[in-house]
């Protein structure tokens, strides 16, 4: 039996990476030299935060997004930690609030002023003190306001409620103490009811973040995970790490059964940590390697092989860290679906890279921009702590659109051809336009309207078929003969469509003449 390549239809097959011009990069940025395997960069629609080198303690820079070009060597820093800063994260519901963690075993919450910093910012709003050793990761809850998670080198995950009026919070609302080694990665599912962790003891765990109990645990010896990621509402986990032969590897897991991975994909023999990023709106997975010069991207599908390789973005400069712009900060006019900010230490440069879907039309592309998470929380901290779960508040990326009311996301989505959900209002609007389009040209010729409308519907129905085959439903050709047959069918279809266009033009001219005659005769009546 001969081998045939597997054809997949995907609107994201031709996505490409577009680096920013030199004028739109951030130059002369003193990026940290820390060996921690973190992103070291956090981005929102207003600011870029990047961990920097600082003597006598830890600090990070907060640069306005529009302030591109060369950075002033004396640019003000956000400093106040006694040890090196290891991680920074913007509050998803407040673009002017950021959390930082440090080797001094504390977490600090900062209010960033809307105007430009003129001097070093040393006054923090809150300080969280609870870890016994340095704190390596911080993560905001995706749906509840003012809930922050932290993990430290004391092998503990702590849950903090920032609604407290105290400026120094000494005790978390919950301490999760089930890990036997350092936590390397944390990830929430869409509504924040589950927390996944990757630990240095080679185990992946799925936890109940409120109860602190372990729901699932992976003891698979063939994959050593460094980073773990929930894949939206697909009930799947993706981890990146190394195989038993020390090759870099990705593994896909069922969140309800972590005994064996669903699939494994070996990449290469490099040693840099792989950072995965998942876009639930497009079902696309991006994999960025520390020290690499490229970005791999895949499309997640429900059918095997699940991870469908699309393309690879190449550049000349290796990245030490990476930042990602939230979807609400993208440029929809250029069909941008993802944006990275590469930290290039060899050139002290931050380079934006936009992932773009090539489209000819400049209008808003509804099919690649379904409703996405907004900057509004769906729960208060107390509601979440009491046991409530809600899906994120969604918003449309169409310019001028308002956030939608909180609504649950679909439990299962069609992965092979992701489409944007359409509101009933849009259907009603479309139906009214179609009805008007069918009546208006023939309002003066009522006796011809029924016959023409019936013919129009019948011919429009035929345009979907070619020689008895539905062009959009038939499978892709697998042999040369099938390909030729499909080509000839399409040629016939094009020829027939041209004839239909010619007929429509003749009908339009006839109608124009009849309307002109009626207008000329109307004064006499």
UniProtKB/Swiss-Prot annotation:
Entries under SMART domains matching the protein: DUF1899 (SM01166), DUF1900 (SM01167), WD40 (SM00320)
Keyword entries, A-Z: Actin-binding, Coiled coil, Repeat, WD repeat
Repeat (WD) residue spans along the chain: 80-120, 130-170, 178-217, 220-263, 269-308
Molecular function via GO: actin filament binding
Listed InterPro entries: Coronin, DUF1899, WD40/YVTN_repeat-like_dom_sf, WD40_repeat_CS, WD40_repeat_dom_sf, WD40_rpt
Coiled coil ranges: 485-524
SUPFAM superfamilies xref list: WD40 repeat-like
Quaternary structure note: Binds actin. Component of the N-Cor repressor complex, at least composed of NCOR1, NCOR2, HDAC3, TBL1X, TBL1R, CORO2A and GPS2.
Protein family (similarity comment): Belongs to the WD repeat coronin family.
Name listed for the protein in its UniProt record: Coronin-2A
Organism: Bos taurus
